[in-house]
Amino acid sequence: MMASLGGDNSQAEGAEVRHVPVLIAEVIDALKPVSGAVIVDGTFGAGGYTRRILEAGADVIAIDRDPTAIEAGRAMEKQFPGRLDLVESRFSALDEAVSKVKGAGSKVDGVVLDIGVSSMQIDEAERGFSFQKDGPLDMRMSKKGPSAADVVNRLKTGDLARIFNFLGEERHAGRIARMIDKRRTAQPFTRTLDLANAIETLVGRNPKDRIHPATRVFQALRVYVNDELGELARALLAAERILKPGGRLVVVTFHSLEDRMVKRYFADRAGGSAGSRHLPETHVRLPSFTPAVKGAVGPTAEEEERNPRARSAKLRAGIRTENPPLEDDLSLFGLPKLPETNELARS
């Protein structure tokens, strides 16, 4: 599924060592896994968090919608017999995964979510996530649904601009969308470098810029293709339903859109009055979470030096109260209204 920008740095024997778990010490400190506990790793990826949780003595239900990640995790499953359950699924359905493994109505002691694309996926050109390596313009975490090429070549110009603007915070969104529309009529975009080079040619590149001109467009396409913001919103609500009182929800994000969603969620789940200064109070909402850490926790300078991909990482965490879950309300996340990918699939 949506795995980390890090991952496990102890791959199967003979594999290339590429994956470094991000904020691992901070995650374990916030999650506090102990022997006998059951923790859900909703974004298994290369298994960096799962391994540390298992080493701390807790059992893990690990979820990923990428079948490649699940298959790679079989070696770890053998290393920890009876303590690791791998489930191929979207992490928004983590409550269903827990029911499948532990039985209907089962609760868990912790949930960890690492929101972003795995370095394992970025590093494999054939997955189509990277603008630095040539590959098919795909970007799907699984092989289901429309690809990034489908989006680029088939969506209306205005819809593309909105996706680049809202999901990538790209200031040249309109110009890039119009360029794509003009070019795709004669020659559709099918390769990552083709799109990246076209964007760079259009907007130029200042030598002082730290990021490639295509970075935000590629981010927006990946987030849209995989419905990453919707997945995150539904996963947070699902975690609230399956955590025991005292259970911990730990979320690591890598860009501001996701961090704002998590911050807004924990603030909403702190409860309080349902009224406002304009309307009388209707009822008091009892908190479903209390803070496990103060604000957002970022990487140390040493980690940033060791792993540049950790620079933008932020960790937020909450502790489940004894109160019932609050209402499932996706509107609290402020998600932008964008075209449905299933409509694209039917077009």
From Swiss-Prot:
UniProt similarity note: Belongs to the methyltransferase superfamily. RsmH family.
Pfam family name, one: Methyltransf_5
PANTHER family in the record: 12S RRNA N4-METHYLCYTIDINE METHYLTRANSFERASE, S-ADENOSYL-METHYLTRANSFERASE MRAW
Annotated protein name in UniProt: Ribosomal RNA small subunit methyltransferase H
InterPro entries the UniProt entry points to: RsmH (IPR002903), SAM-dep_MeTrfase_MraW_recog (IPR023397), SAM-dependent_MTases_sf (IPR029063)
Location within or outside the cell: Cytoplasm
Region annotation (Disordered) ranges: 291-347
TM helices/strands, residue ranges: none
Main location: cytoplasm
E.C. no: 2.1.1.199
Any GO molecular function: rRNA (cytosine-N4-)-methyltransferase activity
A Gene Ontology term for the protein's cellular component: cytoplasm
Function: Specifically methylates the N4 position of cytidine in position 1402 (C1402) of 16S rRNA.
Sequence positions that bind S-adenosyl-L-methionine: 47-49, 64, 91, 114, 121
Top-level taxon: Bacteria
Annotated source species: Brucella anthropi (strain ATCC 49188 / DSM 6882 / CCUG 24695 / JCM 21032 / LMG 3331 / NBRC 15819 / NCTC 12168 / Alc 37) (Ochrobactrum anthropi)
Reactions catalysed according to its record: cytidine(1402) in 16S rRNA + S-adenosyl-L-methionine = N(4)-methylcytidine(1402) in 16S rRNA + S-adenosyl-L-homocysteine + H(+)
Keyword field: Cytoplasm, Methyltransferase, rRNA processing, S-adenosyl-L-methionine, Transferase
Biological process, per Gene Ontology: rRNA base methylation
Enzyme class name: transferase
Gene3D superfamilies in UniProt: Putative methyltransferase TM0872, insert domain, Vaccinia Virus protein VP39
